[in-house]
Regions:
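Short beta-strand->loop
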Residues: 23-26, 79, 114-126
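C-terminal effector-binding regulatory domain of bacterial HTH transcription factors
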Residues: 106-110, 114, 124-168
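Alpha-helical segments flanking ligand/cofactor-binding loops in enzyme cores
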Residues: 24, 50, 91-92, 146
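Short helices/loops that flank or line small-molecule/ion binding pockets
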Residues: 1-7, 88-97
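A ligand-binding cleft/hinge motif common to bilobed small-molecule-binding domains
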Residues: 91-117
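Acidic, Gly/Pro-rich loop/turn segments at junctions of secondary structure
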Residues: 1-84
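Short secondary-structure boundary segments
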Residues: 14, 37, 105-106, 123-124
Length: 168
């Protein structure tokens, strides 16, 4: 798509699929499976990936969710009626008690600290995703792409919400 649209590069967040584009990881994206206290009170909290099938999932689309069980990666295809392509909308739906959501720490840190969202299924953490600068293959990247990439790497390195810690 970036080639057809004429873009020099794009930023992709998540797990990279195989493609013919060049990708440079600029930082990790850590997340958690979360639910509101109200949702947990009404429906309980899943304790294993298999139990997610009995819960409403708040999703971006038809994605799969991955969880770690020791050194094994478990993949689950959650089901749910609420779908949004906007992280803020998914956070709002989760805090409103509409279901469970796998969300990045950078969007949910304050909500978790305030008690509006609660980490669930913590025995099965999701593997860290990544933020990538992607570009068409071919020549060396233009200076503006290298500068953008370097700035993003610096930002991810300095922000506690992207470092995989529960920084206060």
């Amino acid at each position: 798509m970036i080639i057809a649209e004429g873009y020099d590069c794009a930023i992709r967040v998540g797990y990279l699929q195989d493609s013919n584009l060049i990708a440079r990881r600029v930082g990790p994206i850590h997340g958690k499976l979360l639910a509101s206290p109200g949702y947990i009170h009404a429906h309980g909290a899943p304790e294993t990936p298999d139990q997610l099938a009995q819960h409403e999932a708040l999703m971006q689309g038809t994605e799969t969710w991955q969880f770690m069980d020791g050194d094994k990666t478990l993949t689950v295809r959650p089901q749910g009626r609420f779908k949004a392509d906007n992280g803020a909308a998914l956070v709002a739906a989760a805090t409103a008690g509409l279901g469970v959501a796998y969300l990045p720490d950078c969007l949910t840190h304050d909500h978790v600290a305030a008690g509006a969202l609660v980490p669930i299924m913590t025995r099965y953490p999701p593997p860290p995703a990544g933020a990538y600068v992607i570009r068409p293959p071919g020549q060396h990247p233009a200076r503006k792409i290298r500068v953008l990439t370097d700035l993003l790497i610096e930002h991810f390195g300095q922000s506690p919400h992207f470092a995989g810690t529960d920084a206060e």
